[in-house]
Every structure is written in C-alpha cells, then in structure tokens.
C-alpha cells in the first residue's frame, strides 16, 4: 500500500503542478496598478523561466567549483550552500533584469522604487522555490531508490528533473498573480 500511495502521490504532484505551471502561458493580460506592472502569458513564462535557468545554472556551476558546505546531504548530496546562494543571487539579478527588458515593469512609473522592491522580492522568492522544487524531486527519487526519472538525459536526473524547478516555481508564480489580481480587484 505504501508503494501505491507513493505512486499516486507522485502522479498528483506532477499533474497538478504541471497544470498550474502551464497555466502561466495562458494568463490573460493583467495591468496591475495601471502603470507599474503589465503581465501576459508569454512575458510571465519567460520571466519565470529566466529565473529557473539562472538559478539552476549558477547553483550547479558555483556549487561544483566552490561548494564546501552541503545543503541537504540526505536528499541531494551534491548540492551546496554556496551553490544555493549563488543560484539565488543569479535568479534575482536575471529575473529583475528580464522584468525590465521585457517591459513587464514600467521604469518611468512614479512608484518605481516600490515596484523594484516587489520585483526583487518576487524574483528571490521564485529562485528559492526553484531550489525547493529540485529538492522535492530528489526526495521523490530517493524514496523510490532511483537515480533518474528516465534515461532520456542520463546523469541529469531524467526528464522530470529538466522541468521540476520550472513546474514548482510556476505554480507559485501563478498563485501569486491570481491572488494579487483578486486583492486589487477588491481594493
């Protein structure tokens, strides 16, 4: 029964998170606070994806080169605190830069300082969720005593590992946008 429950939980985890994350692509255009933030599906997806890629790449390469302190050795023995910090910093810098380059944020808005703080905070939060998603996928793999979810990308955790970070960060982004929109509509 434990195996059946674990299998069902994994399917629900992957299915729900994938559904929410892909819902980002179909977000209708949102103009929060009239001039500060303008979101749509494509811009939102690119914003989240840029954070995922930057976080994953910097965490991996800085962790390999400079990582001395293990982050969660029982779940993922190769991940380091140094890599995690570097990944988070890169995620914030790349995410914030992407938001401005794609004109998600209007740099000429009167309340630009507040907007920058919000984008920095959101980028930091999403970068952390990227790493949490990766750890959750690693925990699931450890629970089933498998190294890779598939052999499509040998040595790289398999097909789900290419998407776990994006899916986990995506669900949080989607929920934050939806809650923010509801709060602003009620204000």
Residue spans for each PLM region:
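Hydrophobic transmembrane alpha-helices of multi-pass small-molecule transporters
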Residues: 91-92, 162, 169, 178
């Amino acid at each position: 029964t434990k195996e059946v429950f674990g299998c069902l939980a994994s399917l629900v985890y992957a299915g729900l998170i994938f559904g929410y994350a892909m819902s980002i692509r179909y977000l209708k255009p949102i103009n929060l606070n009239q001039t500060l933030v303008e979101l749509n599906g494509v811009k939102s997806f690119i914003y989240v994806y840029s954070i995922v890629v930057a976080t994953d790449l910097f965490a991996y390469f800085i962790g390999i080169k400079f990582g001395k302190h293990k982050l969660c050795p029982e779940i993922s023995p190769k991940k380091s605190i140094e890599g995690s910090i570097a990944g988070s910093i890169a995620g914030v810098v790349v995410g914030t830069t992407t938001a401005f380059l794609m004109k998600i944020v209007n740099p000429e808005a009167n309340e630009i300082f507040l907007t920058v703080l919000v984008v920095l905070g959101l980028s930091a939060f999403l970068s952390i969720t990227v790493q949490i998603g990766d750890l959750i996928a690693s925990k699931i793999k450890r629970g089933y005593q498998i190294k890779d979810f598939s052999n499509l990308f040998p040595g790289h955790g398999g097909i789900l590992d290419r998407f776990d970070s994006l899916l986990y960060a995506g669900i949080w982004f989607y929920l934050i946008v939806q809650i923010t929109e509801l709060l602003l509509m009620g204000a």
